[in-house]
A protein has these predicted regions:
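Bacterial N-terminal signal peptides that target proteins for export
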Residues: 1-9
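Cleft-lining beta-strand/loop regions that shape enzyme active-site pockets
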Residues: 26-93
Length: 147
């Protein structure tokens, strides 16, 4: 079979698939479940979440999500939390382990307003070696609850 015919058949198959998919009630893809995640490198988490979002993913926080894991809130419109959710926040640190205040302030400015306000009302971000935990019950007033 020539490449031209193969390409034509492939194109026709895609068109038929798209038409069939459009006429059916397609189920929503399952959300990515976040639980028992202690975080890691900010850049790694940011790139991972950005790729998931580009693919149309949504997120369900159903357990602990600490440190860099909380970057998922930058896409709060795609996030829901259960009563089992707990988010752990802290200030960022530089390569020497010292507080990175300006970077922490910048990250705080990116979180949704209700989350920023809650953290500020409860003493602000703790130092990098501490953690402020926000429970599922409190989170459900700050981030969309899961259905």
């Amino acid at each position: 079979m020539s490449a031209h015919i193969s390409a034509s058949l492939f194109g026709a198959a895609l068109a038929l698939t798209a038409t069939a998919a459009g006429s059916q009630d397609m189920a929503r893809p399952k959300p990515i479940v976040i639980a028992n995640d202690n975080g890691g490198r900010l850049q790694t988490y940011y790139e991972r979440y950005e790729a998931y979002v580009a693919a149309g993913a949504t997120f369900r926080i159903d357990g602990r999500c600490r440190s860099a894991c909380t970057l998922v809130l930058l896409w709060a419109d795609r996030v829901c939390v259960t009563e089992r959710a707990a988010l752990g926040f802290h200030q960022l640190r530089d390569k020497s382990g010292q507080r990175a205040q300006s970077e922490s302030d910048h990250l705080m400015s990116l979180y949704p307003a209700p989350v920023r306000e809650y953290i500020s009302a409860h003493g602000g971000l703790p130092p990098p070696w501490g953690t402020m935990w926000v429970s599922g019950r409190a989170l459900r007033g700050l981030v969309k609850p899961c259905e």
